[in-house]
Amino acid sequence: IQDSLVGSEMCIRDRYKITGYGDYLPSNDWYALMEDGDVRREMITFDNNLIGPYATLPLGPARVDKWPSEGPLNGTDNISVIRLSEVYLNRAEARANLGNDAGAQADVDIIRQRANPGVAAVSATGAALKTEVYNERRAELAFEGHRIFDINRRKQNLVRALDCTSVPEACNLSYPNNLFILPIPDGEINSNADITQNPGY
């Protein structure tokens, strides 16, 4: 399922600018989730011509090319709203939470071995398997807007990577926090006087 968000408040064009000023940035710990040979690492382009603060990321001068387009800006084409790999990972999480370790392992293996045929099968069980599923969601669904919902659903603290330095107060949030609830879009509030903005916005 795909949707074009160009011209809307949810357009990702400015999140993936090829100049290096996009808001979606690769971190060292995310990159390390994937082993050598994993094709998902190829969504990151290292470019010494990048400008701006993102040219000096600890990972190196890198930009996200997950949604490349043929125009002058990345992110102007349709993006996936839901795809099969997310469905597998949703089922893997449900199976792991229900104690069906074999089923969860099989679902994660489908995703991991598609991206890296040489990777070993998942052998973790119990709590360690839940962590494997969570990390696989983070690797596979990166830069698609899922992680904040995953953290919220698991009632976890938000702890950004060690290379989070530009806005220190946003690097760590303890759960619960009103910032885990997203703001209501201005368009919705402006069109209905009975709607009240969520706390903190």
Regions found by a protein language model. Name each.
Residues W30-I82, V159:
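Flexible, polar/acidic helix-loop-strand segments at domain edges
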